[in-house]
Structures are given as C-alpha cells and as structure tokens.
C-alpha cells in the first residue's frame, strides 16, 4: 500500500525547482562568443546601426570596430551609402553629410517616404567634386581648389576620421580624378605651359604616385583646361576662347572617357594609349556617370542614356513626374551617381516656397532596358533631405561608398 508523501517532504522536493525558476535568466546575446556576435551584426543592414548602438556601450564598441566592417566585406554584406558636401557662400570648408536610405522601400501614390538618415560629418579643406573619388570604404580628396596643392586627404567612412595621404608628384588646382582597377588617374590642374605634368596615376596598393607621359594624349587634349562643367576663358586670348574638356567620373569598360571640344577620347590603362572614339563630341552633358557600361547624364533638362551605336542621347522613359512636378520638378540634376546599380539624382526644385531657403531633393531610380533603344526608370525612393540657404552651392562633391 502506497502512503502519501508528507507535506514537508513535498515542499522539500519542490522548493529547489522554485528557486531555480526564479534565479534563471534568458540567455543574452552578449553571452555568445565575440566572433559569433560580430558575424550576426555584420549581416544586419547598417541602416539599423544607429539604433543598435544605443542598446549598450558594448554594442556601440562592436559597431565601431574596424573588424566588423572587414567582416562585412568578407561575407559580402556591404551596402552603398551616399556622401556629399555643400559649399557655403563665404567659401569656408564645405559641410560633409552621409545619407542612408532605408532599404527595400518604394514610392507609393503621390506621397514621399521619410525613412532616411542624414548625418553631418567632420569636414576637411575645400574640395571640388571632380577631385573626389571613392575607394572602397574611403574617400580621396585630391589637390587644391582655389590654390594649387599636391596634398591628398583621405576620409575613412568606417571611423569618420580624416588623414593625410601621399602627395602627388606636382601641385594641382581642381584636377579630375577617376578610379580604374584600384588606381586613381588624375588629369589637369596645371597651366598651359606645364602640359608635360598633365597626367599622373596613384597605385592604391603600393600607395605611390607615378607621372604618365602626357604627350601621348596629343595637343587636342592637353591644350584644353580641365575644368568640368564650367566655361573658363584662357588668359591672354583676345576672343576669350573656351578651352574645356569633360571627363567621365566613372570608368567605361575599364577605360577613361574624355569629351573634348571636337572629339571624344578613351584612355586604355593597359597599354597607355589614347584613341579617338568619336568625331562628334558629347562634351555638353552637365553631369554623368556609368552603370553597367552605359553612360547616363542630365542633358537638356532630362535624364538620358547614351546609345553608342546611334551616337545619340536618348531620354530615360517613365520619369515624367520627376521632371515636370509643380513643386519638386527640376531644371537639371546637380549630381547623378551609380548607387549599387541604380541611379541616384540630387537637385534643387525649379520653384522654391521660401525666399532665402531652398530644399535639396534626392531620388533613387531603378533602371530597366526594355528594348535595344529604350530604357525605363522607376522611382523607388524620393524625398527632400535638407534645407539650405539659396547661396549654398549644391553637391560640391558627391560619391557613393561601399561600407
């Protein structure tokens, strides 16, 4: 015959369970090995990092670690991020910003999406947009603006810090910098009688500069002043003749693309040769970039792409609202860039409600080639991101960094 347990015995048996349940806590993420935590955070969109950094000091330290960004690069989770700076009316150091657009968002109806993060950054010396180039997670600012300089400033987008890079072989003012195969090619920024110093290259791996033979470019190019998007009269010219070339800020099929007064040229880095590719220049484009070996530009108020076979600019279809909107329509893009295979456009609207202030707008556009001579654009994200004085120059520099 089984006898019931005494109450005291039952309490003695159950008591440890109660104590155990009261003292047990859910496992913490920080209890995991450091490598596992780092791998988890590296797979999360950087859009979430500002909020995650508020969780604890340990999270803040992890999210600021250079090793985390190295892991993101190794496992292929880096994301594009837009960096731009604005010049004030008094020509003081421009203010740098980073713009993060929330991923996987689309424009619906007639409204706009407000999911973005605009963060002011430490500034450096004044720069011209064409002398700024993105290399991985870093931004190189090359040469001087108003005065010549051989200096190179490098901004590390992971730590938000500036440092000095190796100086160029000669001092330059407002040169053009283009990245091709982990080398930065720099053109111009010299006087006409110094055309032998017109061209040099920086090897990112060895961190060294090397002058390139300028004579191979020919007088057609070297007689022009590299002054993109501006008309600059030559001193001493009685008729103030315009000497201008326009250099595409992106490589085209691994080559440098230059539009001069009469002809268009390409430079092949592999054998150091220049070649005339067109007798009819496309120099008049205002701003341009390259996406999947197709040139895109703001030309005659519209966003266009270049048809190489027909040698003509064609309008990107489907962007009528962007061009003709009554309040945010634009008379021309201030800057366009390749944003991870999509087109990002920055502009000031044609009309502005404020007397002394203007809004800076930004749009992300997906591109689709539907036929041999037709490319369509779809606005995936659009918003006013900043309000500035009217005297402020928009997009003094604009680059996309992978981070």
UniProtKB/Swiss-Prot annotation:
F-box domain span: 26-72
PROSITE patterns per UniProt: FBOX
Extent of the Kelch repeats: 138-182, 184-229, 248-294, 296-340
Keyword Transport recorded: no
Any one cellular-component term (Gene Ontology): chloroplast
Domain of life: Eukaryota
Keywords for this protein: Kelch repeat, Repeat
Keyword Signal applies: no
InterPro entries: F-box-like_dom_sf, F-box/kelch-repeat_ARATH, F-box_dom, Kelch-typ_b-propeller, Kelch_1
Pfam families (alphabetical): F-box, Kelch_FKB95
Record protein name field: F-box/kelch-repeat protein At5g39560
Source organism of the structure: Arabidopsis thaliana
């Amino acid at each position: 015959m089984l006898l019931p347990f005494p109450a005291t015995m039952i309490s003695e048996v159950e008591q440890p369970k109660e104590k155990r349940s009261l003292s047990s806590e859910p496992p913490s993420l920080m209890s995991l090995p450091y490598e596992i935590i780092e791998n988890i955070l590296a797979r999360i969109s950087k859009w979430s990092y500002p909020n995650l950094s508020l969780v604890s000091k340990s999270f803040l330290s992890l999210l600021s670690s250079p090793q985390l960004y190295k892991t993101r690069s190794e496992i292929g989770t880096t994301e594009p991020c837009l960096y731009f700076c604005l010049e004030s009316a008094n020509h003081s150091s421009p203010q740098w910003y980073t713009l993060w657009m929330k991923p996987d968002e689309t424009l619906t109806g007639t409204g706009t999406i407000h999911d973005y993060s605009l963060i002011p950054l430490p500034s450096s010396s004044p720069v011209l947009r064409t002398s700024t180039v993105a290399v991985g997670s870093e931004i190189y600012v090359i040469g001087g603006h108003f005065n010549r300089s051989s200096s190179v400033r490098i901004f590390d987008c992971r730590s938000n810090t500036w440092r000095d890079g190796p100086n160029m072989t000669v001092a330059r003012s407002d040169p053009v910098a283009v990245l091709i195969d982990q080398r930065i090619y720099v053109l111009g920024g010299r006087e006409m009688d110094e055309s032998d110093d017109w061209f040099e290259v920086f090897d990112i791996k060895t961190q060294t500069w090397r002058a390139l033979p300028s004579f191979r470019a020919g007088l057609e190019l070297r007689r022009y002043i590299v002054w993109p998007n501006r008309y600059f009269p030559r001193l001493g010219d009685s008729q103030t003749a315009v000497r201008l070339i326009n250099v595409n800020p992106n490589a085209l099929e691994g080559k440098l693309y230059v539009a001069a007064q009469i002809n268009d040229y390409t430079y092949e880095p592999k054998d150091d040769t220049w070649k005339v590719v067109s007798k009819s220049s496309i120099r008049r484009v205002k701003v341009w970039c390259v996406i999947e070996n197709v040139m895109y530009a703001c030309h005659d108020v519209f966003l266009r792409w270049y048809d190489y076979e027909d040698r003509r600019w064609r309008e990107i279809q489907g962007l009528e609202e962007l061009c003709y909107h009554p309040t945010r329509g634009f008379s021309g893009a201030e800057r366009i860039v390749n944003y991870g295979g999509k087109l990002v456009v920055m502009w000031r609207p044609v009309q502005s409600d404020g007397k002394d202030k203007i809004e800076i707008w930004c749009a992300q556009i997906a591109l689709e080639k539907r036929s041999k001579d037709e490319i369509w654009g779809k606005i995936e994200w659009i918003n006013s991101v900043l309000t500035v004085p009217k005297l402020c120059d928009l997009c003094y520099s604009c680059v996309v960094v992978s981070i």
